[in-house]
Amino acid sequence: MPTGEILLNLKKLNVLGSVLYVAAHPDDENTIMLSWLAKERKVRTSYLSVTRGDGGQNLVGSELSDLLGLIRTQELLAARAIDGPEQYFTRANDFGFSKNTDETMQIWGKEAVLGDVVWRIRNLRPDVIVCRFPPDPRAGHGNHSASGVLAEEAFKISGDPTKYPEQLKYVKPWQAKRVVWNTFNFGTVAQTQKPAEKDWIQVDIGVYNPLLGKSYNEIAAESRSQHKSQGFGVPRGRGARPEYFVHKFGDKAEKDVFDGVDITWNRVKGGKEIETIINEAIKNFNADSPSTIVSNLVKAYKMVLNLEDEYWKNQKKKELENLIIACTGLYFEANPNEYSAASGEKINVTTILIKRSDLPITLNKIRLIGLSRDTTMKTELGNNELQRITFPVEIAKGQALTQPYWLAEKKMGKGMYRVDNQELIGLPEKAADLQAEFSFTIENQVFNFNTPIIFKYTDEIRGELYRSFEIRPEISVNISDKVYVFADNQAKDTEITLKSAKANVSGSVSLALPNGWKAEPASIDFNLANKYQEQKVIFKVTPSSKDSEGQIQVIAKTANGTFNRGILTVAYDHIPPQTLFPISEAKVVKLDIKFKGKNIGYIAGAGDEVPAALRQIGYAVTMLTEKEFNEDLSKFDAIVVGVRAYNTEERLKFYQKKLMEYVEKGGNMIVQYQVNNNLQKIDGGMGPFPFKVSRERVTVEDA
């Protein structure tokens, strides 16, 4: 932690306030406001994104839906690491654009998602709740307005113990002081829609922070540019930035958003003495020798442990621990020799530890949580002396798989992810099951610091990198397609890829099929001698004689049990690799298809999987490159333009004339979803007759 940040966080110790910012999606948040709240006002700041952005588009790859939500979760965490707040979610799924609140609430399930918002309020105990959107059509999107409705209703009931009483096993009711709307710039709001002047307060959030060497505009630009899958890179702004808080419910603020809220140590019994010690630490702080204030920090830490207020005790305990680590120059980590392992496998975990200060510190012990290793040491740490200790360990039988917790089970319908563990609901990620605990004595006080066991590796271009240590099933089974369509009674090849997570895995694999369907052979044996080895096998699947549909599931059996999960890793340079293990299954459909034409020319768009679906039905699909455009297009019965192709494919403006000639001669051309942002400038427009692409959307998916 740089010394400027240390001093900033020292000052933050004296602030006992909390704010919750609520919106619908990743990238809805006002990153300048969040940065200002966290680093200028120094209150505990949290962003609750009702969804993970699963329904958006993907400008960096082909992942959509759940996998896009996984990417955008990591992008939000990267953003929060820059601008400072904590990140949370509900179980709601972003199902795409919605024109009104009622539709959104019906699909999400209002009572469930409202309960998730109440749960987060009771956990975070915000003094102020800030809505990004109003609860009405001005929000411009049903998800947006729904987030405003949820925030306001949750504010009204989160302090009522009769509402969602099952939560009270873990949290207490909490009543925030007020709800405000962080409104849009009034210059863009119609006069009739503007709130009365007395109902809002104005703040300048574009100020400069000399401890960080940046303004909040600049910090927020770096933060917002983490939304790379949405193409949200923005320039750094500088200068004054007026923002507005419009009063909605609760006690009205007259001058400051925290009016009437004591955000000093006076709000907790025994806090005044702690404030005095922290002020001494701030006064004595020396950027050339941060360890000189550790004695003050430890003294404050001991007093915090005796606070009656559990919420602020836990919060300030965590803040003090982070500062003590920074000021002592402590660094510690625990790295396995493999990035993944399977149940029962033996690996090595190496702990690395160093202290970069002259302050006396004793290492008491190292404990590997979840791996049954506990080593007592009582070692005095020297200044800048690196210590490595390697522990041979065995992964426990039945150790839980490492994957995004909200994707471990199938969704509860279209609008809600299934999460049965109440304490996990809303967390961006589950804490690592396998951790290393380092126990130190500092200034006669024992500290136990935990860190996840995490794999470290070096990329020759990007340098040192980290990825989560994964527990995998000993055998994973991936099916090649998500859907198999049979237009006749002919058998189709179904390819299965088996992958081992450890050495010497053998057994058999088979398909579970709907009634009337058949696979040949009935099962196939496999024997994988090496870790990460793959083997491909093919079943010939024959459909039912009648039109029908159903699911096929892949099942592998070994001496250690039955396995039915595939493996999928999402990897991009801007996020850590994310691995999940979905149930290995596919939809099978037998139906009578009437073809009119068979040859399709296809222009790929962003994240495009439509060509594979067309081939699955039985069409011959040719991807149109420069070579095909220089040939006769009349051989195609239709030409299909992929999603956002006119936004992402610059070459289209050069080929548009030839495409229109194809249409003029009677050819069929289908253009899928395009947006007016970054649309290619094409002479004559996108079609045979003039038209403009608006921002209006067709959203009834089942029409």
Describe each PLM feature range.
Residues M1-P165, N185:
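Active-site beta-strand->loop->alpha-helix modules in alpha/beta enzyme cores, enriched
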Residues E5, I157-Y331:
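The feature marks non-catalytic terminal segments
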Residues L20, V130, D637-G642, I670:
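Structural motif
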Residues N30-T31, G56-N58, F97-K99, R138-H141, ...:
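Extracytoplasmic/secreted cell-surface and envelope-processing proteins
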Residues K42-V43, S158, W174-K177, K665-N668:
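A short helix->loop->beta-strand "cap" motif at the edges of active sites that frequently abuts
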Residues N337-F595:
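Long beta-sheet-rich domains in secretory-pathway and surface-associated proteins
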Residues T562-G642:
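Aromatic-Pro/Gly-enriched surface loop or interdomain linker
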Residues V641-A703:
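A glycine-rich, often tryptophan-bearing local segment used as a flexible ligand/cofactor-contacting loop or short
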